[in-house]
Swiss-Prot record:
Span of domain PPIase FKBP-type: 171-256
Keyword Isomerase belongs to the record: yes
Enzyme kind, highest EC tier: isomerase
Keyword presence, Cell division: yes
One GO location term (cellular component): cytoplasm
Catalytic reactions of this protein: [protein]-peptidylproline (omega=180) = [protein]-peptidylproline (omega=0)
InterPro entries in UniProt: PPIase_dom_sf, PPIase_FKBP_dom, Trig_fac, Trigger_fac_C, Trigger_fac_C_sf, Trigger_fac_ribosome-bd_bac, Trigger_fac_ribosome-bd_sf, Trigger_fact/SurA_dom_sf
Family: Belongs to the FKBP-type PPIase family. Tig subfamily.
Lineage: Bacteria, Pseudomonadati, Pseudomonadota, Alphaproteobacteria, Hyphomicrobiales
PROSITE patterns registered for this protein in UniProt: FKBP_PPIASE
Coiled-coil residue windows: none
Protein name: Trigger factor
EC number, as in UniProt: 5.2.1.8
Gene3D superfamilies xrefs: 3.10.50.40, Trigger factor ribosome-binding domain, Trigger factor, C-terminal domain
Length: 452
């Protein structure tokens, strides 16, 4: 066997490999000999079929299987001998001339093929004992518990009919009957009866609610609005519509009394119990924010201390996924790059930097996990599946079946578990100081930070 490296540029390598026909033919004959006792052919006693006859019957298919196995084993030896860790699947280029292929399968021609790879660079890990990170912690105050309960009360506040002759104002709930038309023709889904709408909630298409301010009970108005260009129903998107709209009831929001009775409407036995439950929920929420801030700071330190050029193919794959998602989000929101005060080229440059960071950090975390034997157990994955199932009441079996039949989905569950375990490993070694902060500081967004 001859191996010639035809390309070595950075992390990219290409090899041309030549395997003698005699070597392949010997492997084919060995495999055929192993079939003698298993194959049953008319005219031959069990185990007495000559290899030459087996070769006539099964030679081509066995040769194809042998070639596939030989190429796989040869490539693996080449990569292992050179200490290569592949960034992605090797690209094998086989002969295309049919006569040459036939000759190889018949054991008369040497097999010559090429393989192109991109490898993961050697990664020198930092000394994590030198890392210093700050853990931001916020206590849940009584006022924050009360504010959270008040927000729930505001969302569930009762409404009462306004006095006769009163007009609708922002915040009022108006019950409507309407008929919609486009170019004078009614359209599916354009009519409704007894439809409640809180003015200012922006729950109808833009411009609809504004034209209802000041309407009275029994009053009819023709509301003229265009459907958004990114509207979900494509046959309506961007079209001008008219809605003949009548207000049948106008109600004003009432102050909710926050007491034991209010707590019971939420399924809690008393206001004190509601406060306990809210404090627990906020405590978990704050702990989650603390964890995210700490993790972000740690990833930033890993980014600063591990500078290397990651495999271009991995960065391209990550960028393509991100770019596709960005375009889908912008299209859904009906926005352009100009709306975000940037250009497409500037956005591409920025997101390619983020893709580079994500790939590098992923490789660093993987290296840390490998060197310190950090793994994700089946029990940990099962717990993650159970948690997903709990989030979808009534569909638990569907969730279990989905993960049982989708290895890719299971891998997506493993990835964040592995990442968190590696982060915990580093935090055990790093110097972590704790700082008390307010809720506002804990949840403050850091827009200048790159997405991790």
């Amino acid at each position: 066997m001859q191996v010639n490296e035809t390309l070595s540029e950075g992390l990219k390598h290409e090899f041309q490999i030549s395997i003698p026909a005699a070597e392949i033919d010997a492997k084919v004959n060995e495999r055929l000999a192993g079939m003698k006792d298993k194959v049953r052919l008319n005219g031959f006693r069990p185990g007495k079929v000559p290899v030459a006859h087996l070769k006539k019957v099964y030679g081509k298919s066995v040769a194809a299987e042998t070639l596939e196995e030989t190429i796989r084993e040869t490539n693996q030896k080449i990569f292992t001998d050179r200490g290569f860790r592949l960034a992605n699947e090797a690209k094998v280029t086989m002969p295309t001339d049919q006569a040459e292929i036939e000759g190889i399968l018949d054991g008369k021609k040497d097999l010559t093929y090429s393989v192109a790879i991109e490898v993961v660079p050697p990664i020198t890990l930092a000394d994590f004992k030198t890392f210093k990170v700050e853990k931001l912690v916020a206590d849940v105050t009584d006022a924050e518990v009360d504010d959270a309960i008040k927000r729930i009360a505001d969302q569930n506040r009762p409404y009462a009919p306004k006095s006769e002759g009163a007009k609708a104002e922002n915040g009022d709930r108006v019950t409507l009957a309407f008929k919609g038309t486009i170019d004078g023709e009614a359209f599916e889904g354009g009519s409704g009866e007894n439809i409640p709408l809180v003015l200012g909630s922006n729950s109808f298409i833009p411009g609809f609610e504004d034209q209802l301010t000041g309407i009275g009970v029994g009053e009819t108005r023709v509301i003229k609005v265009p459907f958004p260009k990114n509207y979900g129903a494509a046959h309506l998107a961007g079209k001008d519509a008219e809605f003949e709209t009548t207000a049948t009831l106008i109600e004003a929001p009432q102050d909710a009394t926050i007491d034991d009775e209010f707590a019971k409407t939420l399924g809690v036995e008393s206001l004190d119990k509601l406060k306990e439950a809210m404090r627990e929920r906020l405590t978990q929420e704050y702990a989650g924010a603390t964890r995210q801030k700490l993790k972000r700071e740690l990833l930033d330190r890993l980014d600063e201390t591990h500078k290397f050029d990651p495999p271009e193919s991995l960065v391209n794959d990550e960028f393509d996924l991100m770019w596709k998602s960005i375009h889908a989000e912008m299209e859904s929101a009906g926005k352009t790059f100009a709306d975000e005060d940037t250009t497409e080229d500037e956005a591409k440059t920025e997101y390619r930097k983020i893709a580079d960071r994500r790939v590098r950090l992923g490789l660093v975390l993987s290296e840390i996990g490998d060197k310190n034997k950090i793994t994700v157990t089946d029990d940990e994955v099962s717990r993650a599946v159970i948690e997903r199932a709990r989030q979808m009441p009534g569909r638990e079996k569907e969730v279990w079946d989905y993960y049982r039949s989708n290895p890719g989905a299971v891998a997506q569950l493993r990835a964040p578990i592995f990442e968190d375990k590696v982060v915990d490993f580093i935090l055990e070694l790093a110097e972590v100081s704790e700082k008390k902060v307010s809720r506002e500081e804990l949840f403050k967004e850091e827009d200048d930070k790159a997405a991790a």
